């Protein structure tokens, strides 16, 4: 399934979160940014969760060591990480992309596997960092020459790789990781985040093809590219940018970009005018990308019950396994994501928002899943270990 629309190439139990936690979250993020300005990229503990659910999140979560299931990591590495360090998207023609490389680097840090981290990072540098800036080309195709035909970036991949480098610098004390993290984070802040428009800052999905100058309905954004747990960490690498403000703009969009009877966001959202609306030229669906929004909220420990409500409502009413892809205009499923790894996302969201213990299947990744559900499952495991150990019965 192609989760990256080809349009890039053309242009491109109850009351766990109180209503007041969002304000507390904003303050926590601001304090995190101030701390980062005082000591850029020095080792230290990540900021406290911006909103503290009754699931009792860890007060000082660390990514390093958060993936405690060594067997699950070995199986994932054997299936999806080549000897050279290429993370293979098994359901997408065997391509690789900046998203997958970033996820692989994060999981390697979480597993304490520096050797694999180095392999993935080395392949990423050699094959995706081929632009004239510090951002990454978004897609590498093994059966094409050149393998990178589209030099546009994907901002979620840029953010994930920069975040992984920040975590690696803290975990292993390598100044090279610190330097690389800063280079990428600075270009994200300068080139991809619209900070000075007189409106809340926006994260463009890529450098080309999404701005108001390039699209009649622009700017167009993708809320799943707001990788909320990354932003306080990027403040360590590039403290001159207001990452806390970017977090707040994303939280506001999660509340305002809700469409149709199910009140769900679409993958691609037009922010032209006073109100968000589904972007032109893309299916108006809540789908593969958008299912990550509650993952990132929960991982960051932010949001109120209202932020999680439409996702929990959708996933709590399922009459079959898997997650639905929803036509937002009609509020009906048009497809189902059947592989078991996807079920980790509702479990993590219910844990974060309601304190619901995760089911036994949450801790049992399946061996034969494709790259995307397998990756989301391990990310959810790491997030739960970092912030919601009480939901794991620990």
Model-derived features with residue positions:
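N-terminal carbohydrate-binding/catalytic regions of secreted carbohydrate-active enzymes
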Residues: 66-155
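N-terminal low-complexity, Pro/Thr/Ser-rich intrinsically disordered segments
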Residues: 44-78
């Amino acid at each position: 399934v192609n989760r990256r629309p080809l349009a890039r190439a053309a242009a491109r139990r109850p009351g766990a979160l109180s209503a007041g936690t969002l304000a507390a979250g904003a303050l926590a993020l601001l304090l995190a940014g101030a701390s980062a300005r005082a000591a850029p990229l020095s080792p230290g503990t990540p900021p406290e969760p911006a909103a503290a659910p009754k699931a009792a999140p860890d007060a000082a979560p660390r990514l390093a060591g958060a993936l405690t299931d060594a067997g699950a990591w070995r199986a994932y590495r054997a299936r999806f990480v080549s000897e050279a360090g290429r993370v293979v998207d098994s359901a997408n023609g065997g391509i690789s992309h900046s998203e997958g490389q970033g996820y692989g680097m994060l999981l390697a840090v979480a597993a304490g596997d520096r050797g694999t981290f180095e392999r993935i990072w080395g392949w990423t540098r050699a094959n995706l960092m081929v632009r004239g800036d510090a951002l990454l080309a978004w897609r590498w195709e093994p059966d094409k020459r050149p393998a990178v035909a589209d030099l546009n970036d994907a901002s979620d991949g840029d953010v994930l790789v920069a975040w992984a480098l920040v975590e690696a610098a803290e975990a292993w004390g390598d100044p090279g990781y610190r330097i690389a993290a800063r280079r990428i984070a600075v270009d994200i802040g300068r080139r991809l985040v619209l900070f000075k428009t007189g409106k809340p800052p926006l994260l463009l999905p890529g450098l080309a093809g999404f701005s108001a100058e390039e699209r009649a309905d622009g700017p167009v954004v993708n809320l799943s590219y707001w990788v909320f747990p990354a932003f306080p960490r990027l403040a360590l690498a590039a403290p001159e940018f207001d990452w806390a403000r970017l977090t707040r703009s994303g939280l506001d969009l999660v509340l305002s970009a809700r469409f149709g009877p199910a009140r769900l966001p679409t993958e691609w959202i037009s922010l032209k005018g006073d109100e968000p609306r589904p972007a032109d030229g893309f299916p108006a669906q809540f789908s593969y990308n958008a299912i990550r929004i509650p993952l990132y909220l929960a991982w960051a420990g932010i949001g109120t019950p209202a932020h999680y409500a439409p996702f929990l409502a959708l996933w709590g009413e399922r009459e079959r396994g898997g997650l639905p892809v929803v036509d937002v205009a009609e509020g009906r499923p048009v497809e189902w994501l059947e592989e078991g790894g996807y079920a980790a996302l509702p479990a993590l969201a219910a844990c974060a928002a309601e304190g619901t213990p995760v089911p036994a299947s949450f801790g049992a990744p399946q061996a034969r899943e494709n790259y995307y559900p397998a990756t989301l499952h391990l990310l959810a495991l790491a997030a739960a270990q970092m912030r919601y150990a009480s939901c794991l019965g620990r």
